[in-house]
């Protein structure tokens, strides 16, 4: 039971606090993504990101 609780907590942390290398776990808006990445002199693209068993759109700067 404790292992299940730890896995659930880690899943929630990864799902809601992802902000690594230009990726966020919030729904992606293509124009806002491009604008945000333009500040870093990079191109922005909305990608489908899979976290465990769920999927979400996120912004990726490259």
Swiss-Prot record:
The keyword Ribosomal protein does not apply. GO terms for molecular function: potassium channel regulator activity; toxin activity. Transmembrane segments: none annotated. The record marks 62 as: Aromatic residue of the functional dyad. It is found in: Secreted. Keywords: Disulfide bond, Ion channel impairing toxin, Neurotoxin, Potassium channel impairing toxin, Secreted, Signal, Toxin. It comes from the Eukaryota. Expressed by the venom gland. GO terms for cellular component: extracellular region. The record marks 45 as: Basic residue of the functional dyad. Residues 1-22 form the signal peptide. Disulfide bonds join 28-46, 33-59, 37-61. The keyword Transferase does not apply. Belongs to the short scorpion toxin superfamily. Potassium channel inhibitor family. Alpha-KTx 23 subfamily. May block potassium channels. Has the structural arrangement of an alpha-helix connected to antiparallel beta-sheets by disulfide bonds (CS-alpha/beta). This is U10-hottentoxin-Hj2a.
